[in-house]
Amino acid sequence: MSAKGSFTLGMLSIIAAIGLFTAANGFAADAHTTTKFEGVKANSGTATHGRQGNNDTLTWSEDFKIPDTPAPHWQVVDTKGNVFLLQRLKIKGDKENRTITIPSYVHDVAKVQIYCSWAEALLGEASFAKPIVTASGERMHSDSMAMSR
């Protein structure tokens, strides 16, 4: 192979590698993971934010253990300090709400908490490095930008 052919092949390889790296980072940008849960009863695992279309989801990690309390629930806190009580972790028939959809009225998420609604006690919480803006939060922001023009 000539020097020119080797150079062209090398450049194509570099361009392909950059393209793969950029694509991989684009997919990873949709997934955000919290710190480890810490609290009185919830001390393991993390939660991961994902987006499927216009729906934002939270999923707990494989190493998360559901606290042994009567009614543990998902709960999120937004950047303004508003707290939203969401689904139970355990449901009928030993099923689990491992992944939940964040309601559209929640516009951002700063913390994910595990809350016992029976005892009205916080069992543990985990934070995102940066607050997550949900799809509804993005729409609300873009609508307010359009109205200000």
Regions found by a protein language model. Give the residues of each.
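Short, exposed beta-strand-loop hairpins at the edges of beta-sheets
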Residues: 102-127
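An anionic, turn-rich surface loop/hairpin at beta-sheet edges
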Residues: 80-107
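Beta-strand signatures of extracellular beta-sandwich domains
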Residues: 73-77
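Cleavable N-terminal signal peptides
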Residues: 15-16, 26
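Bacterial N-terminal signal peptides that target proteins for export
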Residues: 2-14
